[in-house]
From Swiss-Prot:
Binding residues annotated for Mg(2+) 2, in chain numbering: 179, 181, 233
Protein's gene: fen1
Upper lineage: Eukaryota, Fungi, Dikarya, Ascomycota, Pezizomycotina
Binding-site residues for DNA, renumbered to this chain: 47, 70, 158, 231, 233
Major localization listed first in the record, in broad terms: nucleus
Gene Ontology cellular component terms for the protein in this record: cytoplasm; mitochondrion; nucleolus; nucleoplasm; nucleus
Source organism (scientific name): Emericella nidulans (strain FGSC A4 / ATCC 38163 / CBS 112.46 / NRRL 194 / M139)
Gene Ontology MF annotations: 5'-3' exonuclease activity; 5'-flap endonuclease activity; DNA binding; magnesium ion binding
Stored PROSITE patterns: XPG_1, XPG_2
Enzyme superclass (EC): hydrolase
Compartment(s): Nucleus, Nucleolus; Nucleus, Nucleoplasm; Mitochondrion
PANTHER family referenced in this protein's UniProt entry, alphabetically: FLAP ENDONUCLEASE 1, FLAP ENDONUCLEASE FAMILY MEMBER
Protein's recorded name: Flap endonuclease 1
Region (I-domain): 122-253
Basic and acidic residues compositional bias, start-end: 357-389
Keywords assigned by UniProt, alphabetized: DNA damage, DNA repair, DNA replication, Endonuclease, Exonuclease, Hydrolase, Magnesium, Metal-binding, Mitochondrion, Nuclease, Nucleus, Phosphoprotein
């Protein structure tokens, strides 16, 4: 699910944080990709009649079709992908996962009913809601990646958090996922739509965390608190708190502790905090996720030549893919993985670390900006109060 409305909040308040461009702009870059999110997107790319792509034996092949051709598209454009798979979910996420499972069960029943009585749109809508990524899907995709010569690693828990670690360490240029919570895990750059099909003609969104924080006038802790208020995978949102309200609450109070205190003291009880709402635990999962250090041997990876005959055996003989297309794709992989070895010019220059004085100046400017925002809001509130207090002119 990610963070509800976060893209909208950043687009409206920190537009400089978002760049949209063509996939070829990322030539020569290494990118860590959230594998589970990608596989899910491949599985919901169903045909209009709501059916998954199937082999002759009735096995689902949508995930393999998507993984093979979308990865091929990236490599064709000079990108070197690394896939990161989810490990066990954090305990705090189990409640949300249970709710999702219940929703999928309801959707399955609704899907069956729609097939009998509903429209084509109903069938497709409920079909998408029944989709879930299984261990078998993951295992088959890992087998495919190995045969393609594309590296993958397993994260201890959340794949997005591990992608963020690799991006911060400079082992990859960016983390790629549709989940906006990748930014909460401190990924410096998030790429979205990278694994979308070419037919969708969606530009690649490149979101820079530092620019988002600057535009929002927040530090990382406040940004995480904002994301929890917006609604994340770990907690249900506070009813009636939408994106504008969430942003105002954090700007007015600074921390979730003070937001909660303000809500609980409000005599009007405009908002009601859910009975069990362990926001501090959710914050801790974003600040200190269970991840491997970027220098851990488990995080070593390299790109290798594809096993062409192995791909033919697996995709053509086992899964019923077209042999000419598979061989053609494997040949492109072999050729373009070598081309992707070429370095971008920016790779020759390492960013210079900021001095303590520069960091202090940035912090001072940030604090001044926050104070200025608070002062302006107080003045606006005072002006409104005075306007209300003025006697109305006689008609």
């Amino acid at each position: 699910m990610g963070i509800k409305h976060l893209y909208q909040v950043i687009a409206e308040n920190a537009p400089d944080a978002i760049k949209a461009g063509d996939i070829k702009n990322h030539f020569g870059r290494k990118v860590a990709i959230d594998a589970s999110m990608s596989i899910y997107s491949f599985l919901i790319a169903v045909r209009s009649e709501g059916q998954q792509l199937m082999s002759d034996t009735g096995e689902t092949t949508s995930h393999l079709m998507g993984m093979f051709y979308r990865t091929l598209r990236m490599v064709d454009n000079g990108i070197k992908p690394l896939y990161v798979f989810d490990g066990a979910p954090p305990k705090l996420k189990s409640g949300e996962l249970a709710k999702r499972s219940a929703r999928k069960h309801e959707a399955t029943e609704a899907h069956e009913e729609a097939k009998e009585t509903g429209t084509a749109e109903d069938v497709e809508k409920f079909s998408r809601r029944t989709v879930r990524v299984t261990r078998e899907h993951n295992a088959e995709c890992k087998k495919l990646l190995k045969l393609m010569g594309i590296p993958y690693i397993d994260a201890p828990t959340e794949a997005e958090a591990q992608c963020a670690v690799l991006a911060r360490a400079g082992k990859v240029y960016a983390a790629a996922s549709e989940d906006m919570d990748t930014l909460c895990f401190e990924a410096p750059i998030l790429l979205r739509h990278l694994t979308f099909s070419e037919q969708r003609k969606e530009p690649i969104q490149e979101i820079h965390l530092n620019r988002a924080l600057e535009g929002l006038g927040m530090d990382r802790n406040q940004f995480i608190d904002l994301c929890i208020l917006l609604g994340c995978d770990y907690l249900e949102p506070i009813p009636k708190v939408g994106p504008n309200t969430a942003l105002k609450l954090i700007r007015d109070h600074g921390t979730l502790e003070k937001v909660v205190e303000s809500i609980e003291k409000d005599p009007k009880q405009k908002y009601v905090i859910p009975e069990s709402w362990p926001y501090q635990d959710a914050r801790e999962l974003f600040l200190n996720p269970d991840v491997r250090d970027a220098n851990d041997p488990e995080c070593d990876f390299k790109w290798e030549a594809p096993d062409i005959e192995g791909l033919v055996d697996f995709l053509v003989k086992d899964k019923g893919f077209n042999e000419d297309r598979v061989r053609n794709g494997a040949a492109r992989l072999q050729k373009n993985l070598k081309t992707a070895q070429q370095s971008r010019l920016e790779g020759f220059f390492k960013p210079v670390a900021k001095t303590d004085a520069e960091k202090a100046t940035l912090k001072r400017k940030h604090d001044e900006k926050i104070q200025e925002q608070k002062k302006r809001k107080k003045e606006e509130a005072k002006a409104k109060k005075e306007a209300k207090a003025r006697p109305r002119a006689a008609v």
